[in-house]
């Protein structure tokens, strides 16, 4: 009996853990997010409007036909369509981005703490990849993508995309969260507020402390 009860408890805990790993499933047709809490219901971090007052515009966005501006340090631009742009996405567990890359531009190493990403390339040539966890010996999974190719970045894995062509590239990606979140590794480590003690980073990255200070100066917000 003790063994059976232990198995039940382990199974229950596993199910609870899985349930918390992704956006909760909706318990209604939709839950259009609003900022005004008056007469609203709080779900998934957003207040929901009365469903009888929902309209088509709550489920609509435009502009993904427009190229993003890529004249920045990394030569790329991410245009996000999540619950902040389409309030009707609230509780639906999905969002979308358009990524524009200048020649030799990149979407630098980053991670989405709340979502798996599936990317399709529609223009140009990209070198993409992700690195697995310490438990899997930090293996690199990488491919060169051409238009029509698709690649998946598992939830939480550090990943990147680089335009290896001489012409602009365009990709679209779906994310398994209404608000996937993004942590850009270099910005986070070297550009935190307040900054991480450079001695800590020097030891962690096996760098001279002056090199770390220079990096922190480059990434300072």
From Swiss-Prot:
Family statement drawn from the similarity comment of this UniProt entry: Belongs to the germin family.
Swiss-Prot/TrEMBL keywords: Apoplast, Disulfide bond, Glycoprotein, Manganese, Metal-binding, Secreted, Signal
Signal peptide span = 1-21
- Asked whether the keyword Manganese is assigned, the reply is yes
- Identify the domain of life: Eukaryota
Pfam families linked = Cupin_1
Q: How does it assemble?
A: Oligomer (believed to be a pentamer but probably hexamer).
Please report the name of this protein according to its UniProt entry. Germin-like protein subfamily 1 member 15
Described function: May play a role in plant defense. Probably has no oxalate oxidase activity even if the active site is conserved.
Stretches assigned to the Cupin type-1 domain = 62-213
Cross-referenced PANTHER family: GERMIN-LIKE PROTEIN SUBFAMILY 3 MEMBER 3
